């Protein structure tokens, strides 16, 4: 290669030096081109190929990086667009907020047969169905005191109904949103209360579990009223207490206010993890964190709740309640902030409606880890209930 190239270059130099007609700009360009070709030929094919391959690899890497950045930008714009669109969607469709508050479509635990409470370890419990209104059917569980569990084996609904007239007090339990009357933490609470000598009657509101109907605040309250009246017809003079948890505290205060207005109050009201009203709870809920400082938060997220007829105004209801009130709240509650429970107590305590009744607030330290739904684990709970409600007397056997 080198021998063939050198004469061409020498001949071109001689022509240029002798002043041939090709001299000038064109000749200079030709000369530069010849020199470049000579250098490439002298260098040989070896070193040039790796440099070209490296350049091609770098171009491919840059292309992939640009493609990744483009895809990330698309994802970012999609998420940002969704973030902005959700408030408008909720404002235009208030029913979405109602579903998020009730969460009745979340049925946990899954695949349990609510007709068989014994599968949940409640072998002294009877399942039945009541009909508060036309086209509405609600599933009910009645757990008798633990001391009766042997006698309860194989008994029918009539036996359980008759048992309500025994000397054991009765707790009507109103659960919170999501899940069913067979939720794990709820079942554990039934067991604790049953072991303390209480009848426990609980049910799924319309639209929850195997209950039929469409959820609403009015409907949930009416379901609770129907079950309370059903109990009172069968309980004689036995004390009947109402226990509400989380969203169930809103149902409980609605119910008790109505009972007090008709002058048939329960013997006591227990509120576990209560809030003041649904607007304040929605604003404090962990789901609202990413939108809490969004411009127009109240207009986008809270006003649709009110327009759907959902208020659960515990702070207003307690001003019209005339029975003993016990509030239980864990300091580490991540769902209903502890401050809302304390605020509700501060509203209720000075109310004139409670001047002849005791109002008590029991906090549970955050170190205990009871959070939103595990107060039933407290070893102090039996003592708290005995002191507040009075020690249960042993009843006659059925």
UniProtKB/Swiss-Prot annotation:
The chain crosses the membrane at residues 75-95. Residues 1-24 are annotated as: Disordered. It is a single-pass membrane protein. One of its GO terms (cellular component) is endoplasmic reticulum membrane. Residues 1-74 are cytoplasmic. Glycans are attached at residue 123. GO terms for molecular function: lysophospholipase activity; monoacylglycerol lipase activity; phospholipase activity. Residues 1-16 have a biased composition (Basic and acidic residues). Gene3D superfamilies: alpha/beta hydrolase. Lysophosphatidylserine (LPS) lipase that mediates the hydrolysis of lysophosphatidylserine, a class of signaling lipids that regulates immunological and neurological processes. Represents a major lysophosphatidylserine lipase in the brain, thereby playing a key role in the central nervous system. Also able to hydrolyze oxidized phosphatidylserine; oxidized phosphatidylserine is produced in response to severe inflammatory stress and constitutes a proapoptotic 'eat me' signal. This is Lysophosphatidylserine lipase ABHD12. The gene is ABHD12.
């Amino acid at each position: 290669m080198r021998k063939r190239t050198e004469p061409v270059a020498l001949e071109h130099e001689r022509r240029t030096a002798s002043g041939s007609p090709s001299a000038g700009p064109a000749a200079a360009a030709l000369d530069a081109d010849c020199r470049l070709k000579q250098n490439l030929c002298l260098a040989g094919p070896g070193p040039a190929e790796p440099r070209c391959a490296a350049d091609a690899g770098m171009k491919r890497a840059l292309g992939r990086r640009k493609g990744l950045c483009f895809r990330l930008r698309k994802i970012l714009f999609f998420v940002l667009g969704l973030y902005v669109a959700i408030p408008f969607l909720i404002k235009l469709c208030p029913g979405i907020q109602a579903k998020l508050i009730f969460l009745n479509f979340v049925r946990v635990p899954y695949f349990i047969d609510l007709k068989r409470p014994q599968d949940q370890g409640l072998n002294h419990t009877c399942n039945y169905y009541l009909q508060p209104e036309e086209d509405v059917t609600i599933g009910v569980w009645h757990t008798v005191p633990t001391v009766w569990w042997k006698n309860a084996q194989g008994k029918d609904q009539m036996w359980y109904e008759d048992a309500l007239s025994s000397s054991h007090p009765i707790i009507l339990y109103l659960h919170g949103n999501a899940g069913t009357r067979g939720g794990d933490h709820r079942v554990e609470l039934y067991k604790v209360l049953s072991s303390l000598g209480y009848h426990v009657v609980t049910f799924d509101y319309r639209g929850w579990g195997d209950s039929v109907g469409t959820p609403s605040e009015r409907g949930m309250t009416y379901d609770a009223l129907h079950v309370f009246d059903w109990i009172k017809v069968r309980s004689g003079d036995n004390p009947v207490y109402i226990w509400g948890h989380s969203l169930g505290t809103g149902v409980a205060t609605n119910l008790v206010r109505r009972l007090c207005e008709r002058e048939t109050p329960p013997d006591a009201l227990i509120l576990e993890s209560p809030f003041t009203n649904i607007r304040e709870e929605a604003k404090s809920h962990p789901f609202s964190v990413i939108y809490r400082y969004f411009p127009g938060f109240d207009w986008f997220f809270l006003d649709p709740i009110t327009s759907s007829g959902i208020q659960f105004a515990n702070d207003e209801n307690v001003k019209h309640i005339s029975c003993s009130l016990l509030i239980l709240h864990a300091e580490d509650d991540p769902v209903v902030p502890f401050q809302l429970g304390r605020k509700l107590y501060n509203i209720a305590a000075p109310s004139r409606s409670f001047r002849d009744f005791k109002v008590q607030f029991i906090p549970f330290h955050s170190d205990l880890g009871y959070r939103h739904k595990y107060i039933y684990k407290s070893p102090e709970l039996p003592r708290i209930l005995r002191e507040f409600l009075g020690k249960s007397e042993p009843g006659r056997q059925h």
